[in-house]
Amino acid sequence: MNKEIIIGDWKMPECDTEASMNMWNARAQEFAKQRGVEDDDWVAALVKRHGMLPADGTFLDVGCGAGKYTVYFAKKCAEACGTDFSEEMIKSAEQRAREAGTDNAFFSCDNWHTLELAEKGWKGKFDFVLANMTPAIQSAETFEKLTEASCGWCLYIHPVLRTGSVADRLKKKIFGKKPDPRYPQLQYAFNLLWEKGLFPAVEYREHNWVRSFELERAVDIFKNDLKSKRTLTAEEEASIEKYLIEHAVNGIVEEEVRTTQFALYWEV
């Protein structure tokens, strides 16, 4: 698969940016509650094993969310920077850094899809660039920015398979078909790097979890997730709310998420 085909296939989907931002802002509280990263974490162990981040190096966390990896790796290097387009996520990340007493972690609210690395002063700046389970990477262009921002290593983590017990049913209900659980990003990303003459490596893991939302937040989150894909009618929005009300238990909506994730890493 050559670069022209990949660029044509892997391009930014049409989406409602405002709805997407609203969804991630609504989820900031959930992400803020995630416990900090430990040394035996899959990502942390992989980075250490391959010596991706020198002690005097710089780190960029693309789509940092509430900053758990930014704060963790700040303790391992000279300077860490997290970027995310959700203002609420950035606020949560800054709070996490303060609570951890980390004074070399910095955060920036940006849209990676439109960010100009040169204008930001980020071109070739970072010894290690991480994009972990983030919608910041949605096209060949947004993926290639990882390499452009790095002067050392990059690590890209994303599902190859993913199912969500609530989200999948809602997508089938609204869009008329069950979403394909398979993701093509690994094939695209690997081939883009190979075309550049780089030698990426890949590892996999199974990772499953249950997430819980109070009903009102669940309605907000799932509705904005679907609205980010296309405009919803009033009837469709009402149908989403009705489904969640019917499936809530004691005012709580639970979703089982099952994934097979890949970790693609390469040296620039």
Name what the model sees in each region:
Residues 60, 68-114:
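Class I SAM-dependent methyltransferase SAM/SAH-binding core
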Residues 201-268:
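Conserved Class I S-adenosyl-L-methionine
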Residues 65:
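Conserved glycine-rich SAM-binding loop
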Residues 1-53, 155-180:
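Conserved class I S-adenosyl-L-methionine
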Residues 182-197:
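Short alpha-helix
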Residues 126-141:
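A short SAM/SAH-binding and catalytic strip from SAM-dependent methyltransferases
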Residues 140-155:
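A short glycine-rich, Lys/Arg-flanked "PGG" loop and its adjoining helix->strand segment in the class I
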